[in-house]
Amino acid sequence: MKYALIADIHANLAAFTAVLDDIEHRGGVAELWCLGDIVGYGPDPCRCIELLRQHKHICVAGNHDLAAIGKLPLADFNPDAAIACRWTAQQLSEEDKEYLSNLPTVIERDDFTLVHGSPREPVWEYLVSTGSAGESFGYFKTKFCLVGHSHIPVIFRLSEDGSCSYAALRENIGQVLGKSRMIINPGGIGQPRDGDPRASYAIYDSESHVVRLYRIPYDINATQVEMTKHNLPMRLVVRLEQGL
């Protein structure tokens, strides 16, 4: 079976649609595994929620998902993110809010634990160093953990001696999930932050035990036009073309 590992859609409909089209082009998957932040930053929160719900999927809550329904204080967000969260909250239907409200913060599926931030702090913690990642291995019981939040495609591997190593997930290069425990981030769909503006996602093949990353170009300008139309912060508009 194949599963799409997706994260940080961030209300970017053009990017999400491009990723879903690519998944279908590759033969489809059994299920989407979404690592949170469906909404926030981008201009199409309702349509992205609707599109995700049209597919068989599991999903954990991200910090932007919770902030948009009043479950996290906006004081914890930077000013531009807070502005986008307030705007997002005004767009959501009651059905959208109920869907986001019912998202769990942790899901266990087979050998995987799914969280948005980290297994230690599922909503907020960023895993961007071997130090924080190494400490996180003690907070989940499965062999592997899938995370989002940083928008950077990466694998953290726990060695037999207890040390933690870091490796970037490279485009179209399969990563075999072997004996070592790993924390895997498939990168961000709606707002990549590794210097590559293309949408990022991965497919996991449960028969070959391989995770493969894909980078998908999309119409960035179309998203920027919609963001500008809704008076979302210009810094958020510009960063899409920079991949930062």
Positions of predicted regions on the chain:
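Beta-strand-turn-beta hairpins that frame and shape the catalytic cleft
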Residues: 1-4, 108-114, 177-182
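Acidic, His/Gly-rich catalytic cores of divalent-metal-dependent hydrolytic chemistry
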Residues: 160-244
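Active-site neighborhood of divalent metal-dependent phosphoester bond hydrolases
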Residues: 48-49, 54-141
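Active-site environment of divalent metal-dependent phosphoester hydrolases
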Residues: 10-15, 40-42, 64-69, 120-122, ...
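N-terminal active-site segment of His-dependent metallophosphoesterases
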Residues: 1-57
